[in-house]
Amino acid sequence: KIISGRTCGGNPRQASCYIAAHDARTGKELWRFHTAAGADDPIGDKSWGGAPVDGRSASTWGLTGSYDPVKKIIVWGVANPTPNTRAARHGGNSNAIGMSAPADLYSNSTVGLNPENGKLLWYYQHLPGDDWDQDYTNERILLRTSFNPDTKAVKWINPSIQRGSQRDMSVSVGEGGGLFALDRNDGKFLWAIPFPYDTPRFLISRIDPDGKTWINEDLIVDIPGERHVICSYNTKSYWPMSYHPGKNSLYIPYVDNCLDMRSANPAGGPIPPPPYEIERTTCQGPPLPAGTEAAVPAAAGRGAGPGGAAGDGRGAAGAGAPGGRGGGGAGGGGAAGGGRGGGGGGNPESRTAIRREGSDPQKFAGVAKVNVSTGELTRLFETCSPGNGATLTTGGDLVFWGDLARNFRAIDADNGKVLWQTVLPGSIQNSTITYAVNGKQYIAVLTGRGAVTSGLITQANIQPPPPNTNGIFVFALP
């Protein structure tokens, strides 16, 4: 079988949101599992609070799921529900659904499926009733280890699980933050941490002992013109983490970012000030190759807000911007964001990335090492330059990772010491791989531009790379 996900592009929406299996020889479709619950799903249907079935949406746009051939379970991640806000999905009533799971199933969930028929075996919802377009899709890493979470390192632990017991785990990190360990046999919650940092602005307010998650309702933007900072935001997006069996640890690339979000206000009026100001700093990257020119992102209506924010040109700081375009938004320290609204009067919705309050700009990004048995986290490597590429671990205890300032490096898997580094012509992107030919091991890395590259480069104030730097670079290990 070939298993694949969909991005909800059809009409009606709900019917086009599914994971499907096809016969690998004939291409015949064998089954579908709908990731936005329909009327024929008694548990999932009720979780939508009466929202019209045809308009429900929750896709699997990200990386593919994982398969356990021994247990015969497909484990797959589902993204946020759309429209992005609770009020927009529920006729202006953000309370039409609960603040705890389940809400708007199977959005922001991990689902376990029977590969023979696509039937749901279990689900776990990481973020119920999302209000901010935070995706919990992308990779699920399957591993087996003992359950020994350190109470000093792990905030949320299931007390009913016997310590020291061996568990078949599925571990994942959401775009909005949070590292979750589940039992992949039944979806039971094991433990979770508010990755990459614990903050009162974290999007999940609590997790009950049995694993039920609660959205941080203090940060819901359901009043016209209301403004909040929500953490985190694209903290671990479309760049895979890796698992080192010898260290029993994940190596997670992350960005210490939050979301400065303001709801639309059709009546216009004054725009609330940023919740806090961000110091404008420069991340010093390596010099550009001689004779090249920086590729300055061009977008209509770009402009800097407080702290050097740069929106995507959609969504003005002022009222009545034609087509929703205008300055980079009123948010500070942002990038990769901007407003959503259309033309006419009023203030459109605005979404702008912003560094976490009180964070160190010289430690804006990095690689974290997390022991999957104990949950202990070590910030292995920190830098001012964010990345848009995967980590890769090797049996020789190296971790390869690159950043948007064009640095590609190998660090020690134990202490984070940089053992080797080079500068490439372009920014490092997904995904770094290793392979061998005739006994010789090679590392291959991709450079170019990604969906969030320009925004993060602007936000970190990195010298943009030269244009036309798409390429694949291969290095031989000694």
Question: What positions do the PLM features span?
Answer:
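Beta-sheet-rich non-transmembrane sensory/scaffold domains
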Residues: 1-478
